Amino acid sequence: MPLNRFPCWRYAVACGLLLLLVHVHGQDSVSPIRNTHTGQVRGKLVYVKEGVTGVYAFLGIPFAKPPVGPLRFAPPEPPEPWSGVRDGTSEPAMCLQTDFMRPQISKERKIILPTISMSEDCLYLNIYTPAHAHEGSNLPVMVWIHGGALVMGMASMNDGSLLAATEDIVIVSIQYRLGILGFFSTGDEHARGNWGYLDQVAALHWVQQNIASFGGNPGQVTIFGVSAGGTSVSSLVVSPMSKGLFHGAIMQSGVALLPDLISDTPEAVYTPVVANQSGCEAKDSEALVHCLREKTEAEILAINQVFIMTPGVVDGIFLPRHPQELLASVDFHPVPSIIGVDSDECGWGVPLFMGLDHVIKNITRETLPAFLKSRAEHMMLPPECSDLLMQEYMGDVEDPQTLQAQFRELMKDFMFVIPALKVAYFQRSHAPVYFYEFQHQSSFIKNKDARPSHVRADHGDHVAFVFGSDFWGLKIDLTEEEKLLNKRMMKYWANFARHGNPNSEGLPYWPELVHDDQYLKLDIQPAVGRALKSRKLHFWTKILPQKIQELKGAQGKHSEL
């Protein structure tokens, strides 16, 4: 080759390589491919923040084998490898469930929600990662666990795109088995239960093994969740099975001590009901489990409809003892935590879900004593405690509307606030705890007829401000003040994922729950509060238990006679 032509040849090759690189980069930017331990997966590019910021979404990645056939009522197993490139551009099927939630949300928001298929084959996760992220980026990772009373919900309920793009973090949203498929227990080796919790552990193992390929740092993982998702996060904090799988925890309107989501016994309280509803004439637990494994998805759904909640159990493995015992004995992972509640946890949605909304509306001074007595029994309290509850929450009030409001306050404290405070006080001596009460009344609740005007922050209302979008990623119309609240909450949550501390320059200061029991009132103008519900905490943790012991002592003496 003549020497005078060599530079042209080299120039042509360089141009060709440049064009090839541009072409490959262009392909990657629209249709990214990432490696996992079990195969390659193709995602998609989505734009957020007025279409100027790109996020890669990888949807429906399997983190376990389909829990079907012999794997029904069994611990999850690692996923099978696949050849070729798996499509990760469409939402995964949600786990089998009775869909209580969607009609309620549609009515309240005045929106039409997308249809998502349902299957027992549902152990998948979604990943949202900034488009610039690559292996070695070492971005903080936040793993979202959806709520839904352990009977409903899905990974796709909350879209992590905007949070990932705004705060330059990796968001993972996981699914887990629900209802009886997720939590049925016979109390012995044939079906120990907590299958849904074991799914969550499996998902966290998958994150440790694979998230680096998506730009995440496996050594900087924060788990967060709402309602039953918060209960799940809190349960993972006390479970020996999750050691080393995460480094921070955020419990939003749910902790491991929520009364309806944990059973005191290894055998679930509803096991006889399952046996009866299933039509399984089984002589023992082994035969019952075998019979239930033979049921179709439709038959399982029919059994599920009986239950509005399915509690976890003390199985000796995921939960060696009751969460309260584990917390009291400091047998938990001492990771930094954010724990919080909404100001009107039982303002509307929870009573509606529990079928109590019409009953509450009919409360008067005359009907209240009998109603409180029946609720005390449901709360696993001696019926005689109803007088004490009446005295503490209602006093001499006669006005029906005030009585109804005070009953909702009682429900809120019993179900959410007191359990959250107890967990926070157990943990704060061993790791930083930041507590909040979300107080803002959202402007985007369209159907004011569906939700009473007196409700400020109902159960789960804060979630839209964490993700910057409504359910299923639907855009929300925020006021200018709400946009600032949204920006601040995203920053608090992301700061915590980065540093184990929500604070940074430019944000209202959020103190630890140490001096003067300080917490943050999350509203348009955040403010520091002190000793949230201190009197009620004393009532539920000191006065009421003492009264119960006195009643038991009196009953014991009576039985001796």
From Swiss-Prot:
Q: Where found in the cell?
A: Endoplasmic reticulum lumen
Using the record, list the residue span of the signal peptide; answer none if the entry has no such feature: 1-27
Can you cite an annotated GO cellular component? endoplasmic reticulum lumen
- Annotated catalytic residues: 227, 345, 459
Q: Entry's Gene3D superfamilies?
A: alpha/beta hydrolase
Q: List the disulfide bonds.
A: 95-122, 280-291
Annotated Gene Ontology MF terms?
carboxylesterase activity
* One Pfam family linked to the record: COesterase
> Where does this protein chiefly localize?
endoplasmic reticulum
Q: Which reaction does it catalyse?
A: a carboxylic ester + H2O = an alcohol + a carboxylate + H(+)
Q: What are the glycosylated positions?
A: 276, 362
Q: Where is this motif: Prevents secretion from ER?
A: 558-561
Q: What is its EC number?
A: 3.1.1.1
Q: Which UniProt keywords apply?
A: Disulfide bond, Endoplasmic reticulum, Glycoprotein, Hydrolase, Serine esterase, Signal
Q: Record keywords: Glycoprotein included?
A: yes
| Function, in words | Involved in the detoxification of xenobiotics and in the activation of ester and amide prodrugs.
Q: Which family does it belong to?
A: Belongs to the type-B carboxylesterase/lipase family.
Q: What is the name of this protein?
A: Liver carboxylesterase
